[in-house]
Structure formats: C-alpha cells, structure tokens
Amino acid sequence: YLSKADLAFCNLETPLAPAGGPYTGYPTFSVPQDIVPALKDAGFDACTTASNHTVDKGFDGLKRTLDVLDANGIRHAGSSRTEQERNTPTIMEVKGVKVALLAYGYGLNGFSTPAGKPWAVNLIDIPTMLADAKAARAAGAQIVAVAVHAGDEYVQLPNAQQRSVATALAQSRLVDLIYGHHVHVVQPIDKIGDVWVAYGMGNLIHKQHTAAARAATQA
C-alpha cells in the first residue's frame, strides 16, 4: 500500500556496508545494500538519514549510504557528502505541489561529526532548523515536513527536547508537519496550532521484541 501514497518517507537509521559486507549489528551498524532496492520496490520515495547511527562507519559509510540511495532513485535528507548538498533542500513535487523534507538527529552516540566536515550530519539546533525551513520555502517548497530523530528510547511519551523542538518549529509558521523516530515505540500525535506533530512513529523493520516496540505505525 505504500506505493499508493502520494509520498512515502522512511527513516534509514543504519549505514550501508560495502557490497558483500562485512556486516555489523548493534552498537555500530553496517547493513546490506540489498535493503535499498527493497525500499524502492515497497514504494518509498525518500529516506531520512540523520540519526544517532549516521557515522557508525565514519564518513565513508555515510557517503556510501547516500550513493546507494541515489543509484536506486530514492531521495534523502539529513546527511550530506558536500557542503553544497547540505545547503540544498530536498524538494519533491507531487500532483503539482512541492514538498520539502528536512531531517535532524539529537546526537551521534559519542562520535564526532567527520573531521573538517561539520555539515555532514544535521543535528538538532532550532535556529539552524528554522533557517533551513526558510531556505526550503525560498526554494519553492509549499509544504515543509521535518523529521526529528530524538526522544528517550522505549518511552511512550515525548521528552522535553521533543516538545520544545516541536513547539518552536510549529510556532515559526515555516513548517507544516513534524514527525519523529528513535524511540522505537509509538508516541502521541499532537497538534500545535495548525501543525500536526507525530512524536514517535514506532518501528517498521526491526529486531526489538518488546510489545511496545512491535506496535508499529506507518503514516
């Protein structure tokens, strides 16, 4: 049913491994490239790549992930190979409407952004997020969606950071939709003014066995 959506976004939380591996799991992920054509076949149009695992395999892993997404025709937002790419909004047109996708993560699990490349991963910073939303509008976006990778894992209520970020974005009148991941469970859906906020979307493809983590949403 994803292919029937006007636009379908995924959160690709894990870096992609070189073709043929080696593959690694928690806590530093490196997953098979085969997942990307499967995502395309399922109907996803774009994936966000800003997460606490973005640089698990360094800048090489980040770059490889974006290269494979490009090769399979999947748009992406949240990490970048160049500063120019970082400053170019991801905008898709569907049924004559231009939709921007922005994405940010809360941190990198103790890793630093790649040396000399502070633009490689989008991290949560409200002034930067607002500037990006404004730039997306200036580039022609009529709808701006923001993905926020944040929260307390397995907790079914949003934390203070999630709420403060959502409030700032919604009140800016630059953003139309805010949705979140990272917590691996479903969290409440709220409305701040005219802006819908889905704080936690749950899981889709995962290996987490608690009942809360298995209660998935796809919107």
PLM features per residue range, with description:
Residues Y1-A219:
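Acidic, metal/ion-coordinating pockets
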